[in-house]
Amino acid sequence: MIFLRDNVLLESELQLDHVKPRLLGHWGTCPGIILVWSHLNLLIRNHDLDMIYVIGPGHGAPAALAALWLEGSLGKFYPGEYDRDATGLRNLITRFSVPGGFPSHINAETPGSIHEGGELGYALAVSFGAVMDKPDLVVTCIVGDGEAETGPTATAWHAIKYLDPKESGAVIPILHVNGFKISERTIFGCMDDKELVCLFSGYGYQLCIVDDLDNINDELYTAMEWALAEVKKIQKAARSGNPIVKPRWPMIVLRTPKGWGGPKEVDGKIIEGSFHSHQVPLSKANNDETQLQALNDWLSSYKIDELLPEGKLADAIINTLPKKDEKKLGQLKDTYDPYIALKTVKWEDFAVEKNTDQSCMKITGAYLSKVFGENPTTIRLFSPDELESNKLDAILDHTQRNFQWDEYSRANGGRVIETLSEHECQGFMQGYTLTGRTAIFPSYESFLGIVHTMMVQYSKFVKIANEVKWRGDLASINYIETSTWARQEHNGFSHQNPSFIGAVLNIKAEAARVRHHPYATLV
């Protein structure tokens, strides 16, 4: 996909004019992504699961697109363009990373995606938000070991502590350790198994490490079956009235070489198992005969003629795919048409009488309390420990906080999650919204800037989603910004920063709105 503009089925020896004039894309992470995808197909097939695959290293789009073509999802959503035949395959490969084709990163045009694949660090929090209030949903989230160094990912490992297995689904995190970022070793790639077990046991997980390259399929199959069995055990206990206190959720550590299966060495540089495989391992294949031959040998090693005779799938591939189209990773309805509208509440019941003094936030809290009461499973509030300081505590009249590791707020159906990480709140909100529900994120003006770029990335996803014909409606993501520059009260200069509002205003009006309310009734 990165390389070819012709002869995509290798029906003859590659020539220089078969290779694209400009080579764009990322190869290094793709082997791990496609390995996990193939095993998830088998897991879904064997257990009839509702599953979403959230891919943290979204620059590995070639892996996702290849899998989506193989399972027929591209053909479903782009009929006549990317059908599961030789023409559809040629279109997919030759148009990749060029105008009019798929971009090099996963985005809203990618079936099955609920996460913009550019900025790293947010996949895990999005995954946990997606499974809240969806008891039958399992999200497998692959986190690259480079992405795992980010602050948002570091705090998102704690998200299991906010997941009630009685009412919600489950996330199976897979830490993909291939050892390298763009040009440097990763922290996790330099940790041994004991160090990884100690770290993630401290977070509250139990680990299965998959690293035997000679038996990788057997090991990964066993690991996934184990992880699913552990999930079901935790959920069964909670749903039968005997929840496990501080359950240790499963996660998998997958160790494979970066760029596994690609060229081992080019021009004296180690490629497979090094950072040199991160992007384009044969960057001169369009003008160098030696690299062209290396490309020919590499692509021929996959025996395309056996796997895709005349561009059609061999039975060996078909027999690993989910039997039902609606269960395929690219076709689960939760990822593209999930919207559940809220039951509305009459705002007039909360109107403030003329010439009276009222706190606009207290009135808002009372209104939201009623909304939460009318919508017990389709709305949540994610707050960075600011519910009461923002005078929204009336919400607690109809619901409670949800913190599963606290004996006083576990297993009570609480709709309010308070975690002192704006990144985690934003990630939860995105995942919850993109799977059809509605969420609210209240915070002080100066601190919403922490999620400025997350918000912008999300707006890109929504912009493209609105342009894609096969995606349905979604709720908005909703911020309540308080303690603004116009009304500081006791906080002062330290809490003045209108840049978040400015960032929202920079987004086109069809995608974003800012409302300034002069008095309580208008809130």
Describe the function of each predicted region.
Residues 1-51, 57-58, 147, 151, ...:
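Conserved acidic/glycine
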Residues 5-164, 393-395, 423, 427-435:
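Cofactor-binding active-site loop characterized by glycine-rich and histidine/acidic residues
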Residues 57-61, 143-150, 175-181, 213-214, ...:
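Acidic, glycine-rich active-site loops and adjacent beta-strand->loop/helix elements
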Residues 63-65, 76-78, 150-152, 182-184, ...:
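Short helix/loop capping segments that flank catalytic or ligand/cofactor-binding pockets
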Residues 69-74, 155-161, 186-197, 223-227, ...:
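Short secondary-structure boundary/capping segments
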Residues 76-94, 161-177, 202-204, 405, ...:
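A glycine-rich helix N-cap at a beta->alpha junction
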Residues 95, 397-398, 406-423, 432-435, ...:
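Anaerobic metallocofactor- and corrinoid-dependent redox/one-carbon enzyme cores
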Residues 112-241, 246-250, 479, 484-502, ...:
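Thiamine diphosphate
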